[in-house]
């Protein structure tokens, strides 16, 4: 018993008799309010604990031979699909021929509404054409290439064949109305029909994981003396409006919390024949989910530059939208982890203890203030 008596001396929470305890309405109000606040803070702490936290780490990128997937969704409200060409090139300026892609071009009217329900698949480096029904012609025919014949191409049975032979020779395709194949297929009429239309380009590219660029530009593209050029003879430079809206542009799959800085970017061309350049720094990223799933993707930063590409009015260049990307030698690794239970427990204890302490101070202040006021009132009555 003596030992228990000595143990009681260490009690930090001495109790008073029930008869000496005073319960007030103010104390009840403070208790209810503090209880609700305590519950709210507890739920907030619980929600925070149930979410995962992401730990970033930085490594040297040692991956080799991987492909880079580029997701594209860009609208050109004043550039018809029949005029628009898309090309992908590597850092040396050579066209990437081993590019896997799945790009589509959707015609849009002047209000941005799709002209047809189905988009047409686009081949890199080619503009959109409509080929005449071959069943109505002699399958064994051999039509003229108008002086552009080559060793491997002796016959040009379609307008596209003629354009291809001209492209190979580096000749400008100036007047399609003088080409029988183009007249038959209604090449000029189609260009005229789409004159006031826009175009949406969407899909993806899979290119080699090296620095390079892809671009959207008017005209037929071809290589001339190892230089990538576009034939703009069919277009007046004053009519090339490269206003564009980038709905989405990313390099790889999305992961939780990713920010693609070019998404929903609207750029209005201040004048005709503008060249827009986006200089992109791609950072390889590995995202490891808490369930063990590994997602290999990329994030990027970007800087934009624009200039007039008309040689008569400004700097040399090609009107269009160019995305020039290079890859960082560093890799970011993002790892999802569960939050610490001890941290959650500490937070809960801090909430409970803090609320009890603050509520006790407020209750004591209210109680003693009320007693002091009551004493003054009683003193005034006696005098």
Swiss-Prot record:
InterPro entries: Erv, Erv_C, Erv_N. Its main location: endoplasmic reticulum. Glycans are attached at residue 266. Residues 1-25 are annotated as: Required for MARCHF2-mediated degradation. This is Endoplasmic reticulum-Golgi intermediate compartment protein 3. The chain crosses the membrane at residues 26-46, 342-362. Residues 47-341 are lumenal. It comes from the Eukaryota. The record marks 8 as: Ubiquitinated. It is a multi-pass membrane protein. Forms homodimers. May form a heteromeric complex composed of ERGIC1, ERGIC2 and ERGIC3. Within the complex, the interaction with ERGIC1 is direct. Interacts with ERGIC1/ERGIC32. Interacts with ERGIC2, the interaction is required for the stable expression of both proteins. Interacts with MARCHF2. Interacts with SERPINA1/alpha1-antitrypsin and HP/haptoglobin. Possible role in transport between endoplasmic reticulum and Golgi. Positively regulates trafficking of the secretory proteins alpha1-antitrypsin/SERPINA1 and HP/haptoglobin. It is found in: Endoplasmic reticulum-Golgi intermediate compartment membrane; Golgi apparatus, cis-Golgi network membrane; Endoplasmic reticulum membrane. Residues 1-25, 363-383 are cytoplasmic. Keywords: Acetylation, Endoplasmic reticulum, ER-Golgi transport, Glycoprotein, Golgi apparatus, Membrane, Phosphoprotein, Transmembrane, Transmembrane helix, Transport. GO terms for cellular component: COPII-coated ER to Golgi transport vesicle; endoplasmic reticulum membrane; endoplasmic reticulum-Golgi intermediate compartment membrane; Golgi membrane. GO terms for biological process: endoplasmic reticulum to Golgi vesicle-mediated transport; retrograde vesicle-mediated transport, Golgi to endoplasmic reticulum. The modification N-acetylmethionine is found at residue 1. Belongs to the ERGIC family. The modification Phosphoserine is found at residue 116.
